């Protein structure tokens, strides 16, 4: 089966090239996706587009809500096509693909949540619409301008959030899709076009693709005209973005991270196992927030392990795994055999839907992902802290929730960036940080309009007449 995906340039769907020489392909097993090859015309149109977004925040939120209502409709053609593409090309199960579409609708339709994101990260939901008085100045946040989003394909929703952050801050949004997921950003942009092809938000979007191999001169030219770069992915992807960013541009880096779960002597083993299983199974551990290790403190270790197996089997039913290709199955089997050869105890599902490897803390072979978890029985938090690594550990999920208050300072000081209740790793709460930062702050420029000389300060209750102060040598008189 083949699928053609056209580029979207400044909100307009480009005509798909007729010549095979102008087309590139991405292979997904027996299926292929065809896309145009980036050309000079695409680049020029992206660079030349300079329409300022004069919408107010409520206009932006209302437009996103309207788009979200379409995604909420299970019969919406874009939604149905998107689910089908995730299943056919990316190997998602029906439940996984449907859940992804559901989350897109949830995020777009959460008007209160979108307002609160701006309020929490920028300090006021009005700061991009008007000048706000702050002490001795007025302040307003303006968009950086042209933002490019170099997306990874492991977590489609991360791309959605990246795009929405740029939209909420009124930036032009150029999206470079991943070879592993050329579908999500394209589907979102097409749904914007469905609602209003001439809307300023629609027109501010471009969705393109280029491979990292071969000639990337046109991609580098785009990069040189960007005001802010949002880079997702592994070390090579991040390094490429940094290398080709113009010197004045901010590079917002979302690199690969690891996460784990702490179970602290729970009374409710069923809830503990349910939360841990969720954190293992969501995205089949391809997300930075996915738990790859569990550190269990306390008694009832064996009982917890049995409960975890039960819940992993439950998730295999309610949220079935993505399809594994030959190499992934081989990697799974290899890790199992390596662990057994090393004398570790291994519990594995006969269909490779999950695997539990029991080992001492720090003893770990390769991680094949796909719901493989290393389970460590430890005595106390001090035996866990060495495995929290600065700039490498993202999310630590904890059960019971009350234990988070005991450990959060120690975990944060070691480098943990996010602490959540077990079972909540995929929900980034409003008001929280992402990889140790507030991303919206880096998508805007704060401009100050400062008060005149006759405006008195708290510590200087007279007009600021600097020439007179110099003439009369009275500066020190006003030092508090």
Curated annotation (Swiss-Prot):
Q: What is its EC number?
A: 1.2.1.50
Q: What class of enzyme is it?
A: oxidoreductase
The pathway it acts in is: Lipid metabolism; fatty acid reduction for biolumincescence
Q: Name any Gene Ontology BP term.
A: bioluminescence
Q: Which InterPro entries match?
A: Ald_DH/histidinol_DH (IPR016161), Ald_DH_C (IPR016163), Ald_DH_N (IPR016162), CoA_reduct_LuxC (IPR008670)
What is a GO molecular function of this protein? acyl-CoA dehydrogenase activity
Keyword annotations of the record: Luminescence, NADP, Oxidoreductase
Query: Which superkingdom, per the lineage?
Result: Bacteria
- Purpose of the protein: LuxC is the fatty acid reductase enzyme responsible for synthesis of the aldehyde substrate for the luminescent reaction catalyzed by luciferase.
Spell out the family assignment given in the record's similarity comment.
Belongs to the LuxC family.
Write the protein's name: Long-chain acyl-protein thioester reductase
* Organism the protein comes from: Photorhabdus laumondii subsp. laumondii (strain DSM 15139 / CIP 105565 / TT01)
